[in-house]
Amino acid sequence: MTATPDAPAATSDAPFDLVVRGEQTLTTAGIVAREIGIRDGRIVAIEPLGSGLTGAEVIELADDQVMIPGLVDTHVHVNEPGRTEWEGFDSATRAAAAGGVTTLIDMPLNSIPPTGDVDALNAKRQAATGKLHIDVGFWGGAIPGNTADLRGLHDDGVFGFKCFLLHSGVDEFPHLDADEMEKDMAVLAGFDSMMIVHAEDSRAIDRAPSAEGNKYERFLKSRPRGAENVAIAEVIERARWTGVRAHILHLSSSDALPMLATAKRDGVRITVETCPHYLTLLAEEIPNGATAFKCCPPIREASNRELLWQGLLDGTIDCVVSDHSPSTAELKQLDVGDFQTAWGGVSSIQVAFTAVW
């Protein structure tokens, strides 16, 4: 039995508030048959199915239903305050709960103001008050001119700091160049915080072909793997020099996996995420004009997808997160289908887990 230290032990004369029984329960032992006892809102017992736990309420799961621990999604754009027409905390956390996510960490941009100082963090917390259906935490932003604000945000509870190495897509969250990123990394290393990086190189993107028009192949060429690879190499070396904890966001280019694996072996404190859309969708199958699929970095080819799966299985990629980034339908320009001007983002928190299950 697994029990919290202050929880009463399970006994036959002390039924649980809720017992859930299922043939498929995801545990550290794999998918096994278990029954779960819950008291005062906390799981206090995990026993083999048939152990006879009793409860005021009992839920028997169907054979094809799976009981899982609550998921943690560390890459979510909620957009409140400031852009609630895109989405807000009420809708985002309801969708998360429907998708099995019980904790999300909100990104520092797309809200107005972005989370670049303590006042902005407090504004976001105030906006979230009374609207949350799951647990929520916050990332801070690392942007030009806010180095002096990083320690205050850390002390006030942010989990780390996000920066971009190219235009973020919104003017109020400007990007850092590699030297500015390194300067902030050195500051963060002083209190063991983390720099999380949207790693696409601005110069490489500027030199790539335009994405204008409705051809997905053209959009793919506008965000080449090389732009990711160059930026990731910068993050690795700057993390190596400063000793900071660094994290690569939404890895799309499988070309970067060997250098990331080498950096990990070398002791660089770097972790990597990818997303369900990179693991399940294929560039070859995205119709021209289907801007619902536009995200940056982009969904790539079948050969790339298979290598991402290998990177996940061998531990080079540490986690899978949604990068949930909603907008209005008008911004996705579904009727126009222009990949240059459509908003780049996939709204997926409700379906992310089932997509890769």
Regions found by a protein language model. Name each.
Residues T2-P69:
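Histidine-rich, glycine-flanked metal-binding segment
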Residues E23, G41, D64, H75, ...:
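Divalent metal-coordination and catalytic microenvironments
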Residues Q65-A127, K131:
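Metal-associated gating/positioning segment near the N- to mid-region
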Residues P81, M107-H133, F138-N146, L165-D171, ...:
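Active-site loop-to-helix "anion-binding N-cap" substructures in soluble metabolic enzymes
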Residues V101-T103, I134, F159, D318:
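Short acidic/polar active-site loop segments enriched in Thr and Asp
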Residues L109, A292-K294, G337-A342:
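Short beta-alpha connecting loops at secondary-structure transitions
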Residues V118-I134, M181-V197, V351-A355:
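Alpha-helix-loop-beta-strand connector modules within alpha/beta enzyme cores
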Residues A148-C163, H167-V320:
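Histidine/acidic residue-rich metal-binding segments in metalloenzymes
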